[in-house]
């Protein structure tokens, strides 16, 4: 079943399955589906017959107890279980204990009046686990795969059209760039952009540039380009702006290293014939980020990418082991990378 089919089914009033498994890292659709499941319960009954539990902090048994209870003056109960990390291969010890034996028993005979929904925000589950096999057998599964840039464009434009709005191509391009083609971020900006664009119902470039802030990742991507261009003054100025915006120096450096790591991986694998789609799935990176990395890596030598990555690793060590000013450390890194004989 697709996302669209499930949303239509939830709105139709038709009978629902006993168990659903919503997989994938598309936060926008996770939230939209949870709202749709909640709305199958009449508003007057939602306080008693709808519940959502975060399994990172709440034992599974609490959610199952709720699922096994009869609805209170209503026809059905909906119970949502968020972040069931025990379905993955994650080895980090959980904050709470989960009774998987009780879940196995429940799945063999679900409560007829309850709709139990697992929201699993992961790329994949550990298919070797008995509980995963049993859940997939018992549940109706919906997989929220990553949207390509084209999918994001089409979906966002379709949502605007439903509201009787249009958007300039250059405005949409800028919005995608500033949000890293993250549909959740774009949809979070939609209402604000529409309100700004009244009464014309048309979103222009100035609305996007005036209202939508770039993500830290996009700012760091701009910083990467200045580093590789050996634009010391421009790179240091942007780095200073990030610090003034209260971004943590270690976080900036970590994202910088991650960007250079992605450029190196992309360059090496592209030479081996990997397509953009295969790169995204292999590296587990959003297709839009891979697209930008492919465009960037073509302009630079692997030796420069490696040198920048190692230089940033050195900056990280010094940030952690000395009291030197982060901006000074970055400035010295840039001076050295640009070709001058300076020892950091």
Where are these regions (language model features)?
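Conserved beta/loop motifs at nucleotide-recognition and modification sites
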Residues: 1-344
């Amino acid at each position: 079943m697709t996302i669209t089919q499930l949303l239509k089914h939830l709105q139709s009033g038709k009978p629902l399955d006993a168990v659903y498994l919503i997989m994938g890292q598309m936060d926008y659709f996770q939230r939209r589906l949870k709202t749709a499941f909640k709305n199958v319960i009449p508003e007057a009954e939602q306080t008693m017959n709808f519940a959502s539990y975060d399994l990172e902090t709440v034992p599974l048994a609490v959610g199952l107890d709720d699922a096994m209870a009869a609805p209170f003056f209503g026809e059905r109960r909906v119970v949502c279980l968020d972040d069931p990390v025990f379905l993955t291969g994650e080895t980090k010890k959980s904050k709470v204990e989960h009774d998987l034996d009780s879940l196995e028993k429940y799945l063999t005979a679900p409560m007829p009046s309850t709709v139990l929904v697992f929201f699993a925000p992961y790329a994949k589950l550990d298919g070797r686990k008995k509980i995963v096999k049993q859940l997939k057998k018992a549940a109706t599964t919906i997989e929220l795969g990553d949207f390509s840039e084209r999918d994001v464009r089409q979906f966002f434009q379709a949502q605007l059209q439903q509201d009787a709005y249009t958007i300039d191509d250059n405005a949409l391009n800028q919005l995608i760039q500033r949000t890293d083609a993250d549909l959740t971020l774009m949809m979070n900006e939609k209402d604000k952009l529409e309100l700004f664009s009244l009464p014309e119902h048309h979103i222009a470039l100035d609305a996007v540039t005036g209202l939508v802030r770039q993500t830290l990742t996009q700012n760091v991507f701009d910083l990467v380009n200045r580093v590789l261009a050996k634009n010391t003054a421009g790179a240091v100025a942007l780095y200073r702006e990030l610090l003034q915006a209260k971004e943590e120096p270690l976080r900036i450096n970590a994202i910088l290293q991650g960007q250079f790591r992605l450029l190196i991986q992309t360059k090496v694998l592209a030479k081996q014939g990997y397509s953009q789609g295969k790169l995204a799935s292999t590296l587990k990176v959003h297709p839009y980020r891979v697209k930008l990395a492919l465009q960037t890596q073509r302009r630079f030598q692997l030796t420069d990418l490696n040198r920048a990555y190692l230089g940033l690793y050195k900056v990280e060590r010094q940030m952690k082991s000395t009291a030197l000013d982060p901006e000074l450390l970055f400035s010295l890194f840039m001076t050295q990378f640009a070709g001058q004989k300076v020892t950091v």
